[in-house]
Design a protein with these regions (language model features):
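Sec-dependent N-terminal signal peptides
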Residues: 6-14
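C-terminal motif of bacterial Sec signal peptides marking the signal peptidase cleavage site
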Residues: 17-19
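N-terminal catalytic scaffold of extracellular/periplasmic and nuclease hydrolases
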Residues: 22-189
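Positively charged n-region of N-terminal signal peptides that target proteins for export
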Residues: 1-4
Length: 189
């Protein structure tokens, strides 16, 4: 009896594996053309629950084809700040609180934005805060303190981002080091 049961399980398992591997062109997922990565900075389960409970209709949030949630702790603290959280979202790497786009040793990490650029894709950063804020900066900069906003702005000018919409003009113009990064950006088009 045991031998028959084991053979039956093996046959079912083999059929399951081969049916999953029997992909044909019409069953393949379509090629992804564009990716829009929306981040609700600081938007935890409480905020999402409030949204869902406050609306009588189905929200756009609920209609999204893919939704991901992230629960993290930073490399040096149980509670993650937006610099370490943004870095984890941008690079997949845990880092120290306050670090932006850099690992715990201070080495700049490669973000998903840079990987998209390496594949020849156009990239953009659109924020309702400053472009040098920790979360968006984690996609193009690498610094050991989120307060290094002037350095972050300089790294933005070298980032190759095709479109940027956000605040923080004072980090690019009329700076303590007298650099006019707006002129640099205009030169680059």
């Amino acid at each position: 009896m045991k031998k028959t049961t084991l053979i039956s399980i093996a046959v079912i398992a083999l059929m399951s594996v081969t049916s999953c591997c029997n992909a044909s062109p019409e069953n393949e997922a379509p090629q992804v053309k564009n990716v829009i990565y929306l981040i609700g900075d600081g938007m935890g389960f409480g905020a999402v629950t409030s949204l869902l409970l406050s609306e009588d209709n189905v929200t756009g949030f609920e209609q999204a084809p893919v939704i991901g949630l992230s629960e993290t702790c930073s490399a040096d603290n149980y509670v993650t700040d937006s610099a370490a959280g943004g870095t984890a979202l941008a690079t997949g790497t845990r880092t120290n609180n306050g670090f932006v786009g850099a690992d715990p040793e201070g080495k700049q990490l490669t973000s998903i934005l840079r990987k998209a650029q390496d594949k020849g894709m156009k990239t953009a950063i659109v924020v309702n805060t400053t472009l040098t804020e920790a979360t968006p900066a984690a996609f193009y900069a690498g610094v050991t303190s989120r307060k290094m906003t002037y350095d972050i702005a300089k790294q933005f000018t070298e980032s190759g981002v095709d479109l940027a919409i956000g605040g923080g003009f004072n980090h690019f113009y009329n700076r303590p080091d007298s650099l006019d990064l707006t002129a640099t950006l205009i030169e680059k088009g």
